[in-house]
Amino acid sequence: MQFSPEVLIVLGPLFAAAFAGLLQRYIGDRIAQIITTASIGVSLALSWPIFLNFVWGDAHPYLIELFKFIDVGGFTSTWSVRIDSLSATMLVVVTTVSFLVHVYSWGYMAEDPHRARFFSYLSFFTFAMLALVTANDLLQLFFGWEGVGVASYLLIGFWYQKRSANDAAIKAFITNRVGDFGFALGIMLAFFCYHSIRYEDVFSAAAAHPNLMFGIGAFQVRAVEAVSFLLFIGAMGKSAQFFLHVWLPDAMEGPTPVSALIHAATMVTAGVFMVCRCGELFQLAPMAAGFVTVIGATTALFAATVGVAQNDIKRVVAYSTCSQLGYMFFAAGVGAYNAAMFHLFTHAFFKALLFLGAGSVIHGLHHEQDMRNMGGVRKPMPITWAMMIIGTLALIGFGIPAIGPFPGLGLAGFYSKDAIIESAFLSNGTGAQFAFWCGVSAAFLTSFYSWRLAFMTFEGAYRGSHGADHAHGHGKEGTAEPDAHSHGHGYEAHAKADGSAPAHESPWVMLVPLVVLAAGAVFAGIIFAPYFLGVHAEAFWRGVVPLHGEHEGALPTWVTWAPLTVTVAGFLLAVIFYLWNTGAAKALAKGPLWAFLYNKWYFDEIYDFIFVKGARAIGDLFWKVGDQKIIDGLGPDGVAASSRFFSRNLRKLQTGFVYHYSFLMLIAAVAFGAYAIWAGIGAPR
Amino acid sequence: MSDLMHLPWLTIVTFLPTAGALLILLARVLARGVEPGYDAAVRVLTLIFTIATFLVSLVAFAAFDSNAPGFQLVENVAWAFGFGYHLGVDSLSMTLILLTTFLTPLCILASWSIQKQVASYMILFLILETLMIGVFCAMDLVLFYLFFEGGLIPMFILIGVWGGQRRVYAAFKFFLYTLLGSILMLVAIVAMINIAHTSSIPDLIAYAQHVGFDPNVQIWLWLAFFASFAVKLPMWPVHTWLPDAHVEAPTAASVVLAAILLKMGGYGFLRFSLPMFPSASHFFTPMVFALSVIAIIWASLVAFRQADMKKLIAYSSVAHMGFVTLGIFSGTLQGIQGGIYQMLSHGIISGALFLCVGVVYDRMHTREIAFYGGLVNRMPVYAAVFMLFTMGNVGLPGTSGFPGEILSLVGAFQVNAWFVVAATTGVIFSAVYALTLYRKVALGNIENPKLGGILDLDGREWVTFVPLIVATLIMGLAPSIVLHFTEGAAQSIATAYAGGVTP
């Protein structure tokens, strides 16, 4: 047991959370805010040097072990802080975004009566996430995994009076648990096959016995395939991948800073982190890796199509997150773990920026989230607008590819996203070509929905009717049309004379985090690309994730230019529909395809029918038929009923005549004696 | 110090509560009628005796050497008919005794609101504690049986007299179910004594290891014991007495029922079935696994549909006990350790959940879920406590609910992965019913005007919960402390089982 700065990074937020949470009645909101923010600040200040030492220094991976968590017959987990380039990357991502979100929340949550509780949850989340990324075995990973899950549950349902928030929180937790079902089985199988759950032991055993089989009877698979597959099921839940994505959009019920921190920058990327951490397993498991690729690519495209048709500003960004996570996964699936991690890194900046920017707009418009009721926000909120445009450019991956001797130049997303699309093109892994085309198509849609969001929110005339009625549906129950009729009236009365929105720019405590994140969105790519992806990648990663450097050079020009081309195309399309000819957008929104996309391919309806109603029906069946009719009916109640029946009839035997009784006794004695002799009871042994 | 070590600590722990009961009885006889303040004095006296029992059990714990093999603190006095008054503990029984003595004072605190015949209630509770502790330290089969069955009677009366509206039905159902199983066990006990010519449990274990019961006989003996323990635990399909008993029982009786009486079933499997009938245990493992998996899925889904808070938690107990049997009958070290851990953790968490129900029941006199809603608005501290134990029930890592679950599954996985795949769905279902319950009771706005004046936890309730909160978190974050302690017993059971399976 030793104490060190690395331990403080992880445990500091826990103590701050406990302090703020347990003593909130006595210390008040202000002190709770200061304590939690300061502790994250300390973690931040301690994390960056560690990370930069991997980037520019010559740090080696190291491990700090605290004490045994569980140790039963080789099933051993130790509370650890593992530091290598992978966890160091996550440390700076988590602490940076968390710190900025803490600061931002000072402004965003200023009116909330439960600020101390909010900051306590935020810090607890940060602790769990840090414990997750610094784990040295699968069980601590699982601990952090569930810890961030419960923090997410608490924060989505932070406004506990709202039924929709509570339902979203439960949905998030349960969907994640479906993933954890796979994760837990993966841990068990890893222990069963490799007799350990420590990363190094598992990876080296898997590498030493790559063809170890697992199965019963005719069902036999390679163990490493099965372990990788099961672990990925966990990642699908946490990172909201296709089939298990349904919770993420609903998670937007939480306060916006939470969406930025948990449901964009950090927690949802835990699945990507896990796949990269276990890259040495997926490396050996082409089928599982192919599955990762296909699911990731499908998610990237699917979520982008749904994002196109959403009206709630946060939901658009949420689907965008889902889609970008898909990119990260198919990058990992095709073996480009470094590209996946780099996209995770850059995405954290620009997606947190977009969420906090959206939060600023929502704040400025007094909690209006429906883009149909926005418009004309640029003028009253110029800084927010500028930051959102930077975020948008970074998200769509704007940049000029390398031409001849000139290196490419662009915003953060350009470096990471193009690297992913190119890796998919060059890979000959299962599903890689599918992933490439999904990636390119999704890039087109990303550009379209991002600009749609920017135009609908900031440009044109204000369409809202502030304070008039709040009975309108918030996206979820609303109609599929981008311009609901109910809001047609009265907006001119509320909009300012020049058509701009009656909004106010957010306070500086909210804007400064935006500016910092915008700086990251602009520069994170150009500064760190050489270390994550380029010439210094070997030195940076030091074998923590498998690298495939041999791809360079074989890339056709059209592949290099494809992302930029589709991005510009998406931009132009958005300009046409949402700036020049808004009537066309309304016409588009009346079509059945739009309704299909708006309703998210009807996943919620299908799941509700199968799982929710199914569970209720089976539960009732087991209870009312199984327990009450069959088990109790045949068991105790049946016995009771029949004994009542017999006792009624036996009563007739109670005649009251002594000789009847004595006669019965005689018969019984004879019968018993006969049985004893027959059975040999009492005979000498 | 060495003189202290030789005191008969187990006897003291076991019968100290009875001494308290006698004292109350004596006071009652002397007082001849109810004097003002009598009930209050009885409560305090009972609390003092149960706390003293806990302290003495800590002394016994201190005198116990977890590194030494076999049974310790042994007391063996010849008794009637050749049966011995024979007590002893290993680390398994030591932890269960500690669980019992730890929870009983909290139950007494939770019974403060009992107004009806306080003295009788407390006397029964004290006797019940003696019988429960006795079960775990009895080292003679007949003595074990007496304690095991004796526990039925006070519980029967507690439910039947202090229970809810359908208390008589519930009490009889409870009594008949458990008695039926026990009679079969009695027959098996007689048979075992006849075969092995001893009623001493350590001798029987040694006999099983060195001579061994005939495999064909083992089958019957195993089944007879199984009938008793399966009802007690309870396993599917003999579980339906539990929800009824819980619903009707007063809060503290529910706590004891869930936390300790159920554990006697698991204890029995570990003490008798596995080490004494290893080949039969091995033979029946698929059946036990199947019943466990059915219990987990079935009870979870049924719990999801309950409208009564206690019934929901009772069904969740059935599901959690499924993990216990899964772990125990894997026969692996991880599984047995997981089973033991799950029993301890369930003792604390389900006990605490029943106390949580008791808190609002005391205020509103209903357990109907639909009656509540939005409690967090009026009772934030209660809501936080309830949240913690809900998460424990869900098996969240960091609470005591997690290590037992994962270890049981890891152990069982090594025997049969397919059953474990099915059982692991329990981690999904537990979240479904537990979080739904929490939402319906604690979250949202207060819709029911009757809840408008409901008050948060008072000092007594807070004192009741704090030890449970601390235990849940310590057992969740540093389970290796407990696991290290129980490893000796778990290892010897696993060894005995493994030795008997492969002759």
Placement of each model-derived feature along the sequence:
Chain B
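Alpha-helical transmembrane segments and their helix-start/interface "positive-inside/aromatic belt" motifs
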Residues: Y38-I51, Y169-L179, M379-Y382, G459-P467
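Hydrophobic transmembrane alpha-helices and their helix-loop junctions in integral membrane proteins
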Residues: L106-I114, T130-V142, M155-A442
